[in-house]
Amino acid sequence: KALTAIGPSGRTPERIQLKPGQSSLEVVCELIERLVDTEKVPAHEIAILTPTRKHSELFVKQIAGIETQKSGEVELDKIIVETIFSFKGQERPVIILCEMHKQEYADTRRLRYTAISRASHHLIEVIE
């Protein structure tokens, strides 16, 4: 199903389908390179959101060469990597949502809504 933005004006939401054998980590690294290097989006305007602490910690450990931080910190040259619930009540211009496909969650609909409503300008969802 296509995503449609109904809030303030911004970019059309993107939904990126993983190819067979491709990891969400690989796609996220390519997205960050595109956003920061090509589109000149400041790193602190980007947040990567995952459903669990395990997933967010995995991203922090494995995103090579990219400075990351938790949402309570504010360093302008770093991308935020956080769980959806930890990021609740905050927003960033660009949200990359990933790992929602790994399992069904008790309240998937509410969790997904919380995640997608954090983007003030551009939402990118990486799906399996």
Model regions and ranges:
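Core RecA-like ATPase module of SF1/SF2 helicases and allied nucleic-acid translocases
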Residues: 3-128
